[in-house]
């Protein structure tokens, strides 16, 4: 009798736990396809850490102690139209545009630089906790990656933490999150030393799709650190512009299901 009562008591609890486990299950990400539309020349000495496209021009952050820069680049020719060197002690990282200001991360200092978009004059600084890898602007908050599985959403004036989202797929947390681009409610993200771009839901952190780019042209001979890194979106055409650290080309892609 007692055994029957115990089973009757525990059965609903077990059902609830099973339901909770099933409701937390994440679907395997969709696999995206692409068409290579064009390839443009890219400075093969530029270790790309951040890339964006605005009014037909690239804005690029490059890294390396003593070689970090902020650049304005003509896409089709690869010509650097404007360049600003960072301090020798600085290591440039992610880059985002908000209104008429460019925001550039530094890797380990916890400091970032604000520039005037037109002149590249330094007009301010900002601070954040931990390392800075990738940066994007979603129209309300900055989104920052730091190489972990967590994306931080930051208040634009104070850079205070508003919320965070752990990025997950069907296997669990996904780390090594690097360069970011915000596109229509989704976060497109490079993973360090991975030949793929993740498409992440900005609210839940769930990886909804993966774009495998292992077939793209890259440096020869292969440099182990010349990894895929750099995502820019052209809202006028919907095309994706991608490159990597010290890659000789920027590739323009039409992404499809």
What are the language-model segments listed below?
Residues 26-44, 78:
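A short helix->beta-strand "capping" segment at the edge of beta-propeller domains
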Residues 55-56, 99-100, 139-140, 184-185, ...:
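Short coil/turn segments that connect the beta-strands within blades of beta-propeller domains
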Residues 52, 94-96, 136, 181, ...:
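Conserved beta-strand position repeated across blades of beta-propeller domains
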Residues 39-44, 84-88, 124-129, 166-172, ...:
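Surface loop/turn motifs at the tips and blade-to-blade linkers of beta-strand repeat domains
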Residues 48, 177, 224-232:
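Signature of short aromatic-glycine-proline-rich micro-motifs recurring in repeat-based ectodomains
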């Amino acid at each position: 009798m007692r055994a029957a009562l115990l089973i009757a008591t525990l059965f609903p609890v077990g059902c609830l736990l099973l339901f909770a486990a099933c409701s937390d299950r994440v679907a395997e990400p969709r696999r995206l396809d692409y068409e290579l539309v064009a390839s443009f020349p890219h400075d093969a000495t530029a270790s790309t850490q951040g890339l964006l496209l605005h009014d037909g021009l690239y804005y690029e952050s490059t890294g390396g102690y003593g070689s970090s820069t902020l650049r304005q680049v003509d896409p089709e020719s690869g010509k650097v139209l404007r360049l600003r060197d960072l301090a020798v002690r600085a290591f440039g990282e992610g880059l985002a545009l908000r209104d008429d200001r460019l925001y550039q991360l530094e890797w380990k200092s916890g400091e970032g630089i604000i520039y005037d978009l037109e002149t590249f004059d330094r007009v301010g600084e900002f601070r954040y906790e931990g390392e800075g890898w990738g940066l994007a602007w979603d129209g309300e908050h900055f989104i920052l990656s730091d190489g972990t599985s967590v994306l931080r959403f930051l208040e634009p004036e104070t850079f205070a933490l508003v919320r965070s989202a752990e990025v997950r797929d069907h296997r669990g947390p996904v780390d090594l999150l690097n360069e970011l681009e915000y596109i229509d409610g989704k976060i497109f993200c490079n993973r360090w030393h991975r030949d793929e771009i993740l498409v992440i839901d900005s609210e839940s952190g769930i990886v909804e799709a993966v774009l495998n780019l292992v077939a793209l042209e890259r440096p020869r001979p292969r440099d182990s650190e010349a990894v895929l890194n750099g995502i820019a979106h052209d809202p006028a055409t919907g095309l994706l512009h991608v490159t990597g650290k010290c890659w000789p080309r920027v590739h323009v892609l039409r992404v499809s299901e």
